[in-house]
Amino acid sequence: MTSYSDKGEKPERGRFLHFHSVTFWVGNAKQAASYYCSKIGFEPLAYKGLETGSREVVSHVVKQDKIVFVFSSALNPWNKEMGDHLVKHGDGVKDIAFEVEDCDYIVQKARERGAIIVREEVCCAADVRGHHTPLDRARQVWEGTLVEKMTFCLDSRPQPSQTLLHRLLLSKLPKCGLEIIDHIVGNQPDQEMESASQWYMRNLQFHRFWSVDDTQIHTEYSALRSVVMANYEESIKMPINEPAPGKKKSQIQEYVDYNGGAGVQHIALKTEDIITAIRSLRERGVEFLAVPFTYYKQLQEKLKSAKIRVKESIDVLEELKILVDYDEKGYLLQIFTKPMQDRPTVFLEVIQRNNHQGFGAGNFNSLFKAFEEEQELRGNLTDTDPNGVPFRL
């Protein structure tokens, strides 16, 4: 594992603040939004569709504390862009929005460095000016959007069905306590991680924050490489993974195959009380990965000589299958859902940080084994050729 202290030159102007929202393109926005509300603890926030004058696209916006997800679907059969996207990639992330200061300057510098500006929009809603500028990621499935003081230009009045959903169901379910987006992870095909990281460095003036390679993260069968990109203030972190050659197809390669290329693998949602959050999510029916049963026995032995003390009960963490990673300064707790749709692509992470800014590298091997068990169930833990290239089914 490598940590980087060099942030590069501080940008003259413009500042990335935090994740603003994540937009998914899905086959049925109403059903997807309802699923994330009933399962993950979101609540309806805004809507646009035929009733609000939107004739081409319907969007349902849901919110939990400072986390905002937008689910969008085509309304008409001739929407080729959204239709082709769904056929190739399935339901998944189309856009990641960052809230920024001085959007005009950031866009100007990105354009000078070669970024493709998809479109520029100025939105006025509730007397707040919003500047919405999507950036095209070369050869990527998803776009990045810069948002300055943005409020959604959607009908903020909940639809009758949304009000009914909250009154009859959501208000009776346990609260999950998920607060903010901690980080968002992208997967790339082999040998494309470096070009993706260079895009962030060149166009957005991000820097390398942390990295691991396949000599550090591997099992008997598969491996990965990963680099984390961050803005100057390090309030936004974007890990980028790529598969490394192994005896069998890695879970990163499985993702790339089913997603039809690069894309967002998972979204990490931060909480201050992961035990309550996971109890609530399990009560709501969310399924999580389970690491090998030996994990917690080994963890207890390691913690005996550790410089830090985990405040939470290890027995409770084992009961809920929550993982622990630590260093001499602090620790984090994390757990991963199974895929949120039928394709084994996008999933969620729930994370609690206690003076620890890592990404669970100490858990990667155990997680890889858990992923491999799921791959085996799907029939996707398949052999590779002598060069580590997966055989196609």
Swiss-Prot record:
Gene name of the encoded protein: HPD
Molecular functions per Gene Ontology: 4-hydroxyphenylpyruvate dioxygenase activity; metal ion binding; protein homodimerization activity
Sorted UniProt keywords: Acetylation, Cytoplasm, Dioxygenase, Endoplasmic reticulum, Golgi apparatus, Iron, Membrane, Metal-binding, Oxidoreductase, Phenylalanine catabolism, Phosphoprotein, Repeat, Tyrosine catabolism
This protein's pathway: Amino-acid degradation; L-phenylalanine degradation; acetoacetate and fumarate from L-phenylalanine: step 3/6
Protein name: 4-hydroxyphenylpyruvate dioxygenase
UniProt EC number: 1.13.11.27
Matches recorded under Pfam families: Glyoxalase
GO biological process, one term: L-phenylalanine catabolic process
Self-association and partners: Homodimer.
Swiss-Prot/TrEMBL catalytic activity: 3-(4-hydroxyphenyl)pyruvate + O2 = homogentisate + CO2
Tissue specificity as recorded in UniProt: Liver.
